[in-house]
Amino acid sequence: MGINREEQFLCNALAEVLAGKEPPHPEKGTDMDRVLELAYAHKVHPLLYECSDWEEVSAEWRERLKRESRKIVSQNYRLLFLTKYLTSVLEENGIGTAVLKGVGVAQLYPVPELRKSGDIDLLVSRKHLAKAEELMKEAGFAREEEQWTRHHVSYVIKE
């Protein structure tokens, strides 16, 4: 079973965008609404922002791409600020961290701000975990009541 025209176009467009190039225009008969539905389902739609002005893109999707991209950029700046804040608080207290996924992976994108992310993943050594948790509480974060896994601890910011 092969991939259809829309899936092939999405893969080609993403490859070009991630290489820092303009995405190709679709072949005649390519259903751009379907392409954008796929991109949205895989959370890579912000990478197709440049396509939003193409005539092949419906007005509904054009507006949605622009709106979603602006929202993602805003969320990412907030996450970037919080990441820098948390890592500096921890490092000032002798706790080294490694940033996983999110901000770190975004640097691989041609436009890092368009990498969709919803949280901050920090790796802290087990021996520093108790102190890190204390510092996060002092910084305005609260431990989530329900922890879904054993390999990490989830916090939310108190707002």
Tell me the role of every PLM-derived stretch:
Residues 1, 113-115, 146:
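Generic secretory/membrane-interface signal
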Residues 2-101:
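Helical scaffold of the NTase/Pol beta-like nucleotidyltransferase catalytic core
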Residues 16, 51, 68, 116-119, ...:
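Residue-level detector of solvent-exposed, low-hydrophobicity positions
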Residues 70, 100-111, 147-155:
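Short, glycine/charge-rich beta-strand/loop segments that flank catalytic centers
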Residues 75, 79, 83, 137-159:
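Conserved catalytic core of two-metal-ion nucleotidyltransferases
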Residues 82-134:
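Active-site nucleotide-donor binding segment shared across nucleotidyl transfer reactions
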